[in-house]
From Swiss-Prot:
Residue ranges constituting the PPIase FKBP-type domain according to the UniProt record: 163-248
Function: Involved in protein export. Acts as a chaperone by maintaining the newly synthesized protein in an open conformation. Functions as a peptidyl-prolyl cis-trans isomerase.
Note on domains (UniProt): Consists of 3 domains; the N-terminus binds the ribosome, the middle domain has PPIase activity, while the C-terminus has intrinsic chaperone activity on its own.
Superkingdom in the source lineage: Bacteria
EC number: 5.2.1.8
Organism of derivation: Carboxydothermus hydrogenoformans (strain ATCC BAA-161 / DSM 6008 / Z-2901)
Protein name: Trigger factor
Subcellular localization: Cytoplasm
Origin organism lineage: Bacteria, Bacillati, Bacillota, Clostridia, Thermoanaerobacterales
Name of the encoding gene: tig
Signal sequence residues: none
């Protein structure tokens, strides 16, 4: 087999592939035998008709096409290996010449993984946030714990106010007609939680147990149900019960009740450490994002359209999954946004291109710096996954048997970003 390679623009390669006549004849013979076992020739049992009759019945061209269906993919894989390229999409194949006892010549144009021209990626300046914890931040965490572990006291005689948990019956109407899904009995609602549409909770404030009131609201313009967006509605609300939080005093007893610590001072110190760790994590994430962004900006790479299109589909798939959690379909979202699917895909292209470039640059840096994933690191990661899902490690290994490359890549990616941060200049 002969293979010649021509490099085209935008990370595309054209392979001219010539398969010897002998190989074509072998493939033709194999295809003929397969067809001969199935074709029905009057006066002969299947597979027993003379060759000339079979070829006349189905046509040599048909047999040759069957042969090419097997010969083309086989020879293409060999040609790719011989040319030393890494395709990222299916090839565009065009036949040049072929015959039963002739060489097969065809061209295959395909997008390949592009070469990355790295720029500066070490010594990059990144901003390191100062990690300071104020007394106010600790007090805010204590206040959260007070509310979380507060006792609920029934208010027999008094008005509802923000922070109270109320039990209500409500029934909504729009244009005098019952609102689908707009009614409930014995519904628990914390006033100020903003669970309901704007204006609803505010109008419950001041109501007393046993009181019934009509509440007028307008659905937001961006409400997820398009038929309700921007429209007014009336809810008949009956307040059945008010429960008010009784906060425990901040003392050593409180610390014992809500934590493993014996004193309030110990609890405060622990909260301070946790806040500091959270800030450290946020600072680290921002440094990582900044150093990766700069390394990517400094690199040059011609990204083929197919890689961008694949990433658009990947982003779109995840977006559809997110919409499901919001009980929306992609079609409903597009109708609400007044967009077509093609318009949405076009909007996603810059993000997709950036994603692809980022991964290519990180991969190139890892290759240049010799960053790899060791067997020990892979085993350690599998152990973490097994612990997370409370499954035996061997079971996790079976599940990841076909995805070990992905797992190794995630480790290499993590190590590469760590390398960039460690070799950056924090300012």
């Amino acid at each position: 087999m002969k293979v010649t390679k021509e490099t085209l623009e935008k990370s595309r390669v054209e392979l001219t592939i010539e398969v010897e006549a002998e190989e074509v004849s072998k493939a033709y013979e194999k295809a003929y035998k397969k067809i001969a076992q199935k074709v029905v020739i009057p006066g002969f049992r299947k597979g027993k008709a003379p060759r000339v009759l079979v070829e006349r019945h189905v046509g040599k061209e048909y047999i040759l096409e069957e042969a090419l269906d097997e010969l083309l993919p086989e020879s293409y894989v060999k040609a790719v290996n011989e040319a030393g390229i890494e395709p990222v999409d299916k090839p565009e194949v065009s036949l040049v010449s072929y015959g039963v006892n002739e060489p097969l010549v065809y061209k295959a144009v395909v997008d390949v993984k592009p070469e990355v021209e790295l720029g500066q990626y070490t010594g990059l300046e990144v901003t390191k946030m100062p990690v300071e914890v104020t007394d106010e931040e600790v007090e805010k965490e204590l206040e959260y714990l007070q509310n979380r572990y507060a006792k609920l006291i029934t208010v027999e005689d008094g008005e509802a106010k923000f922070g109270d948990i109320v039990v209500i019956d409500f029934a909504g109407k729009m244009n005098g007609e019952p609102l689908e899904g707009g009614s409930a009995d014995n519904y628990r609602l914390e006033l100020g939680s903003k669970v309901f549409i704007p204006g609803f909770e505010e109008q419950i404030v001041g109501m007393k147990p046993g009181e019934t009131k009509e509440i007028n609201v307008t659905f937001p313009e961006d409400y997820q149900k398009e038929d309700l967006a921007g429209k007014p509605a009336v809810f008949t609300v009956t307040l059945k019960e008010i429960k008010r939080k009784e906060l425990a005093p901040l003392d050593d007893e409180f610390a014992k009740d809500v934590s493993e610590f014996s004193t309030l001072a110990e609890l405060k110190e622990d909260l301070k450490k946790k806040i500091a760790q959270t800030k450290e994590n946020i600072s680290r994430e921002k440094m990582e994002a900044e150093v990766v962004e700069k390394a990517v900006d400094n690199a040059n790479v011609e990204i083929p359209a197919s890689m961008v299109n694949h990433e658009v589909e990947h982003i779109l798939h995840h977006f559809e999954e997110e919409l499901k959690y919001r009980r929306l379909t992609l079609e409903q979202y597009l109708n609400y946004q007044k967009k077509t699917l093609d318009e949405l895909k076009e909007e996603l292209k810059p993000r997709a291109e950036r994603n692809v470039k980022t991964e290519l640059v990180l991969e190139a840096i890892a290759k240049k710096e010799g960053i790899t994933a060791t067997d020990e690191e892979i085993d350690k990661e599998l152990g973490k996954i097994a612990e997370l899902y409370q499954q035996p490690v061997e079971e996790i290994k079976k599940l990841f048997a076909q995805r070990m490359d992905d797992l190794a890549y995630s480790i290499v990616r993590r190590k590469t970003i760590d390398f960039l941060v460690e070799n950056a200049k924090a300012v």
